[in-house]
Amino acid sequence: MAYSKIRQPKLSDVIEQQLEFLILEGTLRPGEKLPPERELAKQFDVSRPSLREAIQRLEAKGLLLRRQGGGTFVQSSLWQSFSDPLVELLSDHPESQYDLLETRHALEGIAAYYAALRSTDEDKERIRELHHAIELAQQSGDLDAESNAVLQYQIAVTEAAHNVVLLHLLRCMEPMLAQNVRQNFELLYSRREMLPLVSSHRTRIFEAIMAGKPEEAREASHRHLAFIEEILLDRSREESRRERSLRRLEQRKN
């Protein structure tokens, strides 16, 4: 029987694959600067020439960007997002916000489920910090800070799900999500009695993730977004009634 020779993988190939994995899973984020070459070689316990070769190949693939005298960075355009014209187009058509909410139902429900199932202690600490940041922003009545904290919180939950496709989808949708979250808070701040209810829904998601209860986390996420959707529908109905009343007044004048 003939045996084929086992070929050891080239060290630079192993380093390249490891860096690709760190980028793919989100440990190395778009725009993030890599540690200096000497430090990175020490962390990987490899020679600097092997590391340099791996980095050069990742540059050629468009995953890394080397700046003269400034270090090496993960490409900031790695997660190609929806274009600004598309975001503007969606904002000009309010009915599209319901489509986005339906999409959020699916993505955020799955993210909460797997975050409860897979989150590490570090993930949970990050989620806890952002949940607290949301509470502080709401107490101070800072709409900008609260909407930004909510977006960062959802990104942290999705990262904690440890599903690279899910994270990529969220990154692509980030401009639209930021706008949607902001618009929702503008409405909520005009009906401040709703804010405590929204907070209680979010707290249930948070507690389910922290307790490692995936089904409860997913259900809490669905209830939260269903509540937001109902508030939007109420506003739409109110606006329709107001428009009808104005039309009737105009008809009477004529």
Swiss-Prot record:
Keyword Translocase (UniProt): no
Keywords: DNA-binding, Repressor, Transcription, Transcription regulation
The keyword Phosphoprotein is annotated on this UniProt entry: no
Annotation: DNA-binding region: 37-56
SMART domains, sorted: FCD, HTH_GNTR
A single GO BP: negative regulation of DNA-templated transcription
Role description: Transcriptional repressor for the pyruvate dehydrogenase complex genes aceEF and lpd.
Protein name as catalogued: Pyruvate dehydrogenase complex repressor
Organism: Escherichia coli (strain K12)
Lineage: Bacteria, Pseudomonadati, Pseudomonadota, Gammaproteobacteria, Enterobacterales
